[in-house]
Amino acid sequence: MYQPAAPSPHLTADLFSVLLLCLADGNLLVFTAHVDSVLTSKEPLGAFCSPEEVKATADTELPDLYPAKYTLELESRNIYKMDELYPMPRTSGNQHPHTLHVTHPYDYFWFPQQKLARAILACFTFAAARARQLYGADTVTPPEPVAVQCTFSDVKSFGFLAYQLNTLDLREDNGIKNQVWVDGPYDLYESCNHETGLEGFSPIAFQRFLALYKNGLAA
């Protein structure tokens, strides 16, 4: 008996997602995340945590940034579009976000914290925009968490993270929180140049990369 195979995961390059959130103080935040590529799948990734574990995040205290304000490094604009975007249409066979790939050009210096923050922001923006696409523009708490994975890399290293969107309510510090798990970054090699070639190759990064790719995908 012939059984049609499920569509294979699809890799699309150079995508961005847009999310708008209005906070309790009246500030409208426009999140725009650009990624180098996105692996999408027919079925969504399963939640990384149980409902009980998600509920327990309400007891987690967030760091106090005072006297710094959360908009300190944000650019203020008076002209913007009120359009949210998740780049994959709901009619697509592979519409669910699986793994985002974020690279950091070597011609600009990035601190490790900046690389990680950029990856987390990309996960939040893509997952939240997907939740709004699925459940409506007014969605605050999606009925099901939206899970997404991400790799972030430069010339020499790879880092990995898993992100679970539980809420879009950023107005208060109480209530359930979103969750992120970070692994790495891991160096791919010790040195690489034209004279000696590649030295000190480490397979760990590729092992992690393969694990993320295979997670939730049919064999």
Regions found by a protein language model. Give the residues of each.
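Acidic, metal/cofactor-coordinating or nucleic-acid-engaging core segments within structured domains
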Residues: 108-140
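Arginine residue identity/basic-tract feature
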Residues: 77, 90, 118, 130-132, ...
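Hydrophobic side chains in beta-strands
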Residues: 39, 124, 152-153
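Charge-rich, low-complexity intrinsically disordered linkers/tails
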Residues: 1-111, 177, 181-182, 187-219
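Generic structural motif
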Residues: 42-44, 127-129, 155
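Short connector loops at helix/strand junctions that flank enzyme active sites
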Residues: 32, 117-119, 145
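Metal-dependent nuclease catalytic regions and adjoining charged, substrate-binding loops involved
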Residues: 132-211
